[in-house]
Amino acid sequence: PGRYMHLSEPRTCFMTGKLLQIPASVTPWIRFPLFWLSCHNLPMWLYQLLVNRVLKHDGYFVTYFHPWEFYPLGEHPEFKMPFIIRNHSGKGMEERLDVLIRKLKEKGYAFMTYSEFAQIKLAELNKPDEK
């Protein structure tokens, strides 16, 4: 988990030279990562609570999922995948993501691609200071 917290870097979008870095969201203060593995293993109510805190604090939430997470890994012991990866994989992950999206849409949050998000953030970061 420590490798996902990047304690020496900003929690939110930042520039490295001319490159916009868009890190996956972590909670304010303790920097708990809210990426795919958290969605697999946290109770859904807790994951949603943490996502809502990030949205209130940062104004946006960034996460990602891998295609294999939607495959029923639990049905294949020969893969020898750890429980934290098999947990809620396949249909379970599909249902969790569906619930998350529906709840966020009910609250009026917009969804967009990384490219769309990058365009908005780059415009904000490149806006001249108004004084």
Residue ranges with predicted function:
Residues 41-131:
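C-terminal domain-boundary segment and adjacent tail
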Residues 1-64:
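Active-site-adjacent pocket scaffolds in enzyme catalytic domains
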